[in-house]
Amino acid sequence: MGDRIYILVMVLNKEEYLDDILDKLAELGVTGGTIIDSTGMAEQLFCNERIPIVGGLRQIFEQCRTSNKTLFSIIENKETLNKAQKVVQGEICDFNDPGIGISFSVPVENVIGIPTDNLNQLKS
């Protein structure tokens, strides 16, 4: 496995894109990942009861706690990573549009808990 392993992280403010993203990743052979509910820091600070907001502005918003979906997926090589990000960015959503979310990847030095055989299956 001469290539590096990466973790792909996508924070989706628009949850409606999640299923399409998962379908596209699966088509590329990326079948493992973890999805968690998350909240952005700005949202959390705005909803914090201890921070005063002028004129009860907080009450304008019926649902203060909106959640994002954050996807973490280990990807075995740079080629698959680039394809995954390109397909999602080009066919499903544009992370450059305000309010969509963010996507980034980080090289991973050590992976413990996933046997090498399972990492190889990520490509197939």
Q: Which residues make up each language-model segment?
A:
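Positively charged, small/polar-rich N-terminal and surface patches that mediate targeting and assembly
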Residues: 1-124
